Amino acid sequence: MRSAPYSSSGAGAADGARSRNTGLSCDRFYASGRSAVCIASHPGISQKTKVNVLDRELNTRKTVVVGGIPNRARVSPSGRMVAWTLFVSGDSYASSSFSTRSGILDTRTGYLVKNVETLQLYLEGRRYHAPDVNYWGITFADDDNRFYATVATKGKTYLVEGDITTWKARTLRRNVECPSLSPDGTRIAFKKRVREGAKNPWRLHVLDLGTMRETPVAETRSVDDQAAWLDDSTLAYALPGRAKGTSDIWTVPVDASAAGPRLLLSDASSPSMVVAGG
């Protein structure tokens, strides 16, 4: 049994990383356990996305059609739970032309939540209601019940911990976007807004869930991605490539005192770690 990084596309491998042509066309992809998810824009007048749930051989098991533009995708460590985030338009409360919709699918039972905004949200300990609540960037714990995500309201972002069984979520910390839970379940990698405006607004950080201490990683470029853990000490993420409209996958140790960023794969996106030959 061996593990290898996987991406939704790739033309140039660096330092031994490999890619293969699967025949899939995905705007976002993620694989874990015995499942993968491929979310792709669906041609048509209205904004639609196909969420294709795949088995380990990347055969389609189930397809869900939802409204919006692909943004994020995640699968729980076991492969049972699948989540996605889409950009949507038309919300009257939105300060810009877009807001988000996040959904969760239980592949074992078929239970589908197309919009997690029905969660009972507790903001800083108090039950919270507001029409502008948006969730994105879901990441699952290994019990297929607990999850983390970003929630935004009144111009602020928060890390939330959610419970699927009770359908409740509570905020843990401000200024956390696109969380990614470490394989050992003790840390969250996330992008933190470090400056206002559209130019280089984010920097990757790692949050210790036990101490709530956050540490920036050695990557100083602005990363607009939901980083993936390749192991307990390495993150992978996409950055814009040299050609317009392309991206490359980079890695960085979570220990800021270790080596700096390294190019893993050119012309690729949506990194994830899969186990081959198991």
Ranges and model annotations:
Residues 1-278:
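Sequence signature of WD/YWTD-type beta-propeller architectures
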